[in-house]
A protein has these predicted regions:
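SAM-dependent methyltransferase catalytic-core segment centered on the flexible catalytic loop
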Residues: 214-241
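Hydrophobic alpha-helix-in-membranes signature
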Residues: 68, 81, 210-211, 240
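Residue-level signal for well-ordered alpha-helical scaffold segments within enzymatic catalytic domains
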Residues: 53-57, 79, 96-100, 143, ...
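SAM-dependent nucleic-acid methyltransferase catalytic core
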Residues: 2-8, 12, 18-51, 56-64, ...
Length: 241
């Protein structure tokens, strides 16, 4: 298994040594804004554990824009809590959920940790996808439920584009009924779903790139994410030093 992590800091910031004398003060100021740090979704390969290691770098650049070409479960972005962010992912269902949270999403479906309900909601979600209604509020809520209830936080689709993650068999699961705290956090963040190579980067952007794993089981989208895509990521970042 390869875990490809690439980090690009603003040019002038990357040339400086970290000012560790100011780090404590910066982290204190940041902590006051960090009342929401826990991701809404379970996400395989989340990098929440890296946030303490990234903070010394981020504290030098926190007035710039944070860019994640593969934002996933938002563990890093929620941990760093930038004022401005460009958050992209090739998974349209993920971005649809975040976009609805930003609008003020509230639960309008029944959510229980029951096998029968899981498969019923999974069938309904796939029916919405087939009907071209993957952008709807209902699809966003179903995606959230399936993520919380499905196996190990996986997001997997078959070749026809159907969500096929099995039931998770957890003892207990907590579900959110509303997402208002996250809405406030998301206000100044831009969410997009496009190929990473089409993102317009600025010289002052702080870029954190964590592409999908290069392993066979990750049919992360209908079209997947191949080794050639991994190479494209590296080449794209080289073009934006």
């Amino acid at each position: 298994m390869f875990d490809h992590l690439l980090l690009r800091t603003p040019r002038h910031a990357g040339a400086r040594k970290a000012n560790f004398e100011n780090t404590s003060q910066c982290m204190t100021e940041l902590a006051s804004r960090n009342h929401v740090v826990k991701p809404l979704l379970k996400w395989a390969g989340g990098k929440r554990w890296q946030v303490p290691h990234l903070r010394p770098l981020w504290n030098q650049c926190s007035h710039y824009r944070l860019v994640e070409p593969f934002c996933g479960g938002l563990a890093v972005t929620l941990g760093l809590r930038p004022r401005r962010a460009l958050l992209n992912d090739v998974n349209p269902h993920l971005i649809n959920f975040y976009s609805w949270v930003k609008k003020g999403l509230r639960s309008a479906i029944t959510m229980k940790n029951e096998k029968g309900m899981f498969f019923a909601h999974r069938d309904r979600f796939n029916a919405l996808l087939e009907a071209g209604k993957s952008h709807t509020r209902e699809a966003a809520l179903l995606f959230y439920y399936l993520n919380r209830t499905g196996y190990n936080g996986l997001c997997r689709f078959n070749r026809r584009g159907g969500f096929n993650v099995p039931f998770g068999r957890y003892k207990t699961i907590s579900y959110a009924n509303e997402f208002l705290d996250y809405r406030k956090v998301f206000e100044a963040w831009e969410f997009t779903t496009r190929d990473f190579s089409t993102l317009e980067l600025r010289k002052t952007d702080f870029v954190y790139a964590d592409p999908p794993y290069d392993v066979p089981f990750t049919a992360y989208t209908k079209d997947g994410f191949s080794w050639d895509d991994q190479i494209r990521v590296a080449e794209w970042l080289v073009q934006h030093p």
